[in-house]
């Protein structure tokens, strides 16, 4: 999914989902994103922030947001292996950890709890939900607080990208799923 958010002077946000058709968002393939790049560049020139939201039936793509360098290094030292690392603004990082869904009735809850746990430990403790947008690399972070004296904004930088799943996050996901199953069994009694 590609989302464009225009920040209004009064603090309000105007949101536009590029892949929404007939009220449904299905996401874009990498090829479709490439085809839509001219439109995305036009939106940026109009002052809009661009975000990607990875969507998958088979995997969770967990965003860990608002990390400084120390938290990012600790995340990696602790054994987590992000598929993507972005520098969303100078000294501020986002990581995306990919984990296969387990195919149980609790997949949504497992993803949400995994996101909560990782963000409480390493990122933004207020971030919730497994499906969450991250800044689009190669585009500007147009938050007013990041505007430079010359009127420009920092570009979101892609520091790392590889097709990988995180074994440590999968272990945590399995543990959370087992807890969900125990709770469901207890409630059923």
Q: Where are each of the predicted segments found?
A:
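Signature for HUH/AEP ssDNA processing cores
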Residues: 1-93, 98-116, 120, 182-183, ...
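A broadly tuned "polar low-complexity/structure-edge" signature
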Residues: 2-8, 115-121, 126, 130, ...
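Long, charge-rich alpha-helical interaction segments
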Residues: 20-21, 148-189
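Short, glycine-/Ser/Thr-/acidic-enriched flexible segments
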Residues: 69, 141, 163
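Short, conserved secondary-structure transition motifs
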Residues: 97-103, 125-150
